[in-house]
Amino acid sequence: MTAGGSGTGAGALARLLGIRPVSMGDGRARFELTVREDHLNPNGVVHGGIVYSLADTAMGAALFSALEPGQSCTTLEIKINYLAPVTSGELAAEASVIGRTKRTGVLEARVHGDGGALVAVATGTFYIQSAR
């Protein structure tokens, strides 16, 4: 993501997965996804990579919303804890910046399922690059 570019976090992969931006600003972002059959693993549960992608997208957008014009950010690492299985319905990721230096941002995303059940918590470190 680069300031002045798309910045919505809804890149090609996010669109392919059906991830939708809901809100973004002031170091926060919310993205949603409707679970589809092709999101399920062979056990009938949403694949962890889908939940991870939703959290990553929300965290990147949250940090992007706090960047200066011309800056960009990219994921360095993410740790995710899966707390409950999801088999259908809606998923929502709410992300926020919890720490920042000149070159890195630390973010948290909480992913909720239908009824507000917490299904995953992720923390991520992102690299911040200045305009060239």
Ranges and model annotations:
Residues 1-132:
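Terminal targeting signals and extreme-terminal segments of soluble enzymes
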